[in-house]
A protein has these predicted regions:
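C-terminal interaction modules
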Residues: 2-5, 9-14, 19, 28-36, ...
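Short N-terminal segments immediately surrounding and downstream of signal-peptide cleavage
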Residues: 34-51
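Hydrophobic residues on conserved beta-strands that form the core of alpha/beta folds
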Residues: 41, 109, 136-138, 174
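Short, small-residue-rich packing micro-motifs
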Residues: 44, 72-134, 153-162
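N-terminal post-signal-peptidase region of extra-cytosolic proteins
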Residues: 52-69, 73-78, 93-94, 138
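Short, solvent-exposed loop/turn positions at domain surfaces
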Residues: 54, 60, 66-68, 86, ...
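Extended lipid/amphipathic-ligand handling interfaces
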Residues: 97-102, 138-142, 184
Length: 268
């Protein structure tokens, strides 16, 4: 009498197949994770250096990868653009120092000006400078730091959250058409002011001297909304203009308020 065939070879084959599937799945997940955090240099103008933050840096070139722990440093006339795998874009103005951590999704602005464009639905990106951090999952804006004198953050479209890194619960939302101006060692966030989006789009070198942003239509939509409100007299932006290395905000055409006539006592 013949004994039934053993099931051991079949089970062993099935086990091998399962192991191969698991290894392939793990490889795919690791590849996707690397893609999500991969950042490359896509534009270089004049002097731009890249490398580990605490080591000698090399001249950056288009196509180079930016890794966690790296820093990028632009010269007096230098500019650069970085592109993430999810189409997040960061542009750096002259005399700007930025370091990267958390798989490059957290950036620290030590000095200078940077534009950020974070597509809607992208993984959250954070920018730290001084006592302030800015985070968003969908917005286009500009942030500038000048030594210990000031920090400026303005939003062209979308919404960003600004918060203090040394005080829990101290945060506010900055919407499109708003600008936050404060000091690097601030202990309480001021209310944001308004600015003219169209004027910034015309004067900012981080926009004017680069190809159009992917969020261009969203910004134009915000411009149109502003124009309608300004025509109705319900929206009065601050008289700010963008000059210099990227976002040097300066008052222009400043007109003093008319003096009020002294009131006359009529005896009533």
């Amino acid at each position: 009498m013949n004994s039934p065939p053993s099931s051991a070879p079949r089970a062993e084959s099935w086990g091998r197949g399962l192991l191969i599937c698991l290894l392939l799945a793990a490889a795919c997940l690791n590849g996707n994770a690397a893609q999500l955090t991969e950042t490359r240099v896509t534009e270089v103008a004049k002097e731009v250096k890249l490398g580990p933050a605490q080591a000698a840096q090399r001249r950056a070139g288009v196509g180079e990868s930016v890794r966690e722990g790296d820093a990028i440093n632009t010269g007096a006339a230098g500019r650069s653009e970085l592109t993430f795998a999810d189409q997040t874009i960061v542009r750096l103005g002259a005399k700007t120092i930025v370091s990267f951590s958390d798989g490059t999704r957290t950036m620290e602005l030590g000095e200078g000006a940077m534009l950020f464009q974070i597509p809607k639905g992208a993984r959250e990106a954070r920018i730290k400078t001084g006592a302030i951090a800015v985070s968003s999952t969908g917005a286009t804006g500009i942030i500038e730091r000048h030594a210990n004198f000031y920090i400026k953050c303005l939003v062209l479209e979308g919404t960003v959250r600004c918060y203090l890194t040394n005080r829990v619960g101290e945060s506010l939302l900055v919407q499109s058409g708003q600008i936050l101006i404060t000091k690097p060692d601030v202990i309480a966030l001021p209310e944001p002011a308004h600015f003219d989006i169209a004027r910034v789009m015309k004067t900012c070198v981080l926009i004017r001297d680069f190809p159009p942003l992917l969020s261009q239509r969203l910004i134009e939509s915000e411009e149109q909304k502003q124009s309608k409100l300004m025509a109705q007299g319900t929206y009065i932006p601050s008289n700010l203009v963008i000059f210099g290395r990227g976002t040097l905000v300066t008052l222009v055409n400043s007109t003093p308020a008319p003096s009020q006539k002294p009131q006359t006592n009529t005896g009533h």
